[in-house]
Design a protein with these regions (language model features):
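Conserved cytochrome P450 K-helix E-x-x-R motif and the immediately C-terminal K′/meander segment
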Residues: 46-87, 106, 113
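Cytochrome P450 heme-thiolate "Cys pocket" and heme-binding signature region
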Residues: 123-154, 179-184
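Conserved beta-strand elements of beta-rich interaction domains across eukaryotes
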Residues: 9, 94, 101-103, 122, ...
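Conserved cytochrome P450 K-helix/beta-meander segment immediately N-terminal to the heme-binding cysteine loop
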Residues: 67, 97-125
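Cytochrome P450 heme-binding "Cys pocket" and the immediately downstream C-terminal segment
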Residues: 25-27, 147-187
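Central I-helix of cytochrome P450 enzymes
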Residues: 1-34, 63, 90-98, 135, ...
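Conserved cytochrome P450 catalytic core segment spanning the I/J/K helices
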Residues: 1-14, 42, 46-49, 53, ...
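C-terminal helix/juxtamembrane-tail motif
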Residues: 167, 186-204
Length: 204
């Protein structure tokens, strides 16, 4: 079911984005300032607003780099024997691509464990299958067909959450208390729930 697959992964990505933002207050402040400067006193940001939010888009790319929807891409079967990076792969071998490792490769990414949306601001790298260092949705003929829906949904959800609310940790918690453990499964969900306090902006 393509709709179920799209909503499940988008929900997981939204939680990971908010997790990363709460753990990185500098990024939270910067992306909220951008969103609120564009949104002003609007009740709801739409697609016309989203195109004016480059830092939000960079933040989403960085979220998908570190916390991609699925660590392993859809498996392939080799049609014939081949050599991949010096390794012999016999015909009829099931091959998995570990996107998690690719997207944290220190030979490709500077400080790969750091959540830094700025790395995408002056970069043409995108997650639509043309740049193999960033493939959270796969690549080639079997790339995820729901990329456009996932991208727009993520952008709208996060833009409006950040525009309309201020976010705080529950009393007694600090950002170091938030873990990034993952539940086992096809979709990479956060193991422990993210609990935040949302405060409505009074002047909206």
């Amino acid at each position: 079911n393509i709709l179920a697959a799209g909503t499940d992964t988008t929900a997981a990505a939204s939680v990971w984005a908010m997790t990363a933002l709460v753990k990185n207050p500098r990024v939270m402040k910067k992306v909220q300032e951008e969103v609120r400067n564009v949104g002003g006193t609007k009740d709801f940001l739409d697609e016309d607003d989203i195109i004016k939010l480059p830092y939000l888009k960079a933040m989403i790319k960085e979220t998908l780099r570190l916390y991609l929807p699925s660590q392993l891409l859809v498996p392939r079967e080799s049609n014939e024997e081949c050599i991949v990076d010096g390794y012999r792969v016999p015909a009829k071998t099931i091959v998995y691509v570990n996107a998690w490792v690719i997207q944290r490769d220190p030979e490709v990414w500077k400080n790969p464990e750091e959540f830094c949306p700025e790395r995408f601001l002056d970069s043409a790298i995108d997650f639509r299958g043309q740049d193999f260092e960033l493939i959270p949705f796969g690549a080639g003929r079997r790339i995820c067909p729901g990329i456009p829906m996932a991208a727009v949904t993520l952008e709208l959800v996060l833009a409006n959450l950040l525009h309309s609310f201020d976010w705080e940790l529950p009393q007694g918690m600090v950002k170091e208390d938030i873990d990034v453990e993952v539940l086992p499964g096809i979709t990479q969900h956060k193991k422990n729930h993210l609990c935040l306090c949302a405060k409505t902006r009074s002047h909206i």
